[in-house]
Amino acid sequence: MPLPIVAILGRPNVGKSTLVNRLAGSREAIVHDEPGVTRDRTYQEAFWCDRDFTVVDTGGLVFDDDTEFLPLIREQAELALAEAALAVLVVDGQAGLTAADNEIADWLRHQNRPIVVAVNKCESPDKGAAQAAEFWSLGFGEPLPISSIHGSGTGELLDRVLELLPPADEAAGDETEIGVAIVGRPNVGKSSLLNSFLGEQRAIVSPIAGTTRDAIDTVIERNDQRYRLVDTAGIRRKRGVDYGPEFFGINRSFKAIRRADVCLLVIDVLDGVTDQDQKLAGRIEEDGRACVIVVNKWDAHEKDSSTIYEVERQLRDRLYFLDWAPMIFVSALTGQRVEKILDQVNTVVEQHRRRVGTSVINEVLGDAIAWRTPPTTRQGRQGRIYYGTQVTTQPPSFTLFVNDPKLFGESYRRYIERQFRESLGFSGTPIRLFWRGKKSRELERGANRATRV
């Protein structure tokens, strides 16, 4: 089951990115005292009281100005809220309640999501309650005074968030239907591939539009399995895109990636893997989606009996961070091998949803440690892995309980991930490893101890 999402919203310069970094225990979100630094939404994993979830950072909301990037920022916030289980509205306790805060609150009342108000910049515990009091008028219950910089009050905020999140064992969506996003640069043959699917399969639902801002889905059925296919906008380099319909179409494509079970990354074999293909592949991995690499226009490529192996080697050299994704060579124009794509989709989705028993995980860890012991510092402190367990699926995610996460460098973390893949498979899906210190439950409740490989 995918991790539940918590959207962090608010007007510019109230400290949203600082709060995200505090909740996720990282510094990935860019922080600057100039409004509008965050434009795209960014996702980070967080952990609190045995619950894993995702926090999404959004740009500052401004409703009365349509200049420059502001419409895009609003669109990003709407997309974040649409996929979130709840939202945290961040306000500035030093500035007090503003007209912009009220305008955002009016908008949130129509979004049908639980809302928690976090009154940031309450650095003084003595004054925090008084600073937060005036935000009762927003109508979202008790406002919580916090300091994102110092961490005070964030434990109470996280407690409130967990109260409102859906139960951990609650199913997310209809797992009998497989969502497939067809993504790639312009003119690589995405629409031709969709048409080829429709020519081969029986369409059982007319194209369904969600809102006017959503991509159009097409549902097909094959061997009693339903697939929801999304043909996304071609994704180009940012400097080649005007801030108009195409720009918003591309952002809807990114949303399609996040809500899909599996992405078909379509590559034009005549062009090879471009820089933009690499960035798109990175987005798929970052969002934790299963993936099949579809190499299109194979009919137009000159070849002999060994060509396919050489071409695959060249493509994989450029897509090394998707080395876990299967690759298939097709021609959407002629239909060559298109029918085999859905077989690959079934396989990778099964791996994406797969669970592994704790005993098996710890057997893999034991073998890995026997082959290569954890590193030791110059002061003689050695890393110790006590045990591991799977915490979620889609993508498969594991928590490793260790004496101190800081003792495990990137090299050893990558080694453990390789051992997981060699022993457990997981073809077609990324995996996540979280490293948690044994004393994490005793530490100050302001920072996340789980770190992603």
From Swiss-Prot:
It comes from the Bacteria. GTP 2 binds at residues 184-191, 231-235, 296-299. Residues 4-169, 178-353 form the EngA-type G domain. Keywords: GTP-binding, Nucleotide-binding, Repeat, Ribosome biogenesis. The keyword Repeat applies. SUPFAM superfamilies: P-loop containing nucleoside triphosphate hydrolases (SSF52540). InterPro entries: AAA+_ATPase, G_ENGA, GTP-bd, GTPase_Der, KH_dom-like, KH_dom-like_a/b, P-loop_NTPase, Small_GTP-bd. GTP 1 binds at residues 10-17, 57-61, 120-123. Gene3D superfamilies: 3.30.300.20, P-loop containing nucleotide triphosphate hydrolases. GTPase that plays an essential role in the late steps of ribosome biogenesis. Belongs to the TRAFAC class TrmE-Era-EngA-EngB-Septin-like GTPase superfamily. EngA (Der) GTPase family. Associates with the 50S ribosomal subunit. This is GTPase Der. The gene is der.
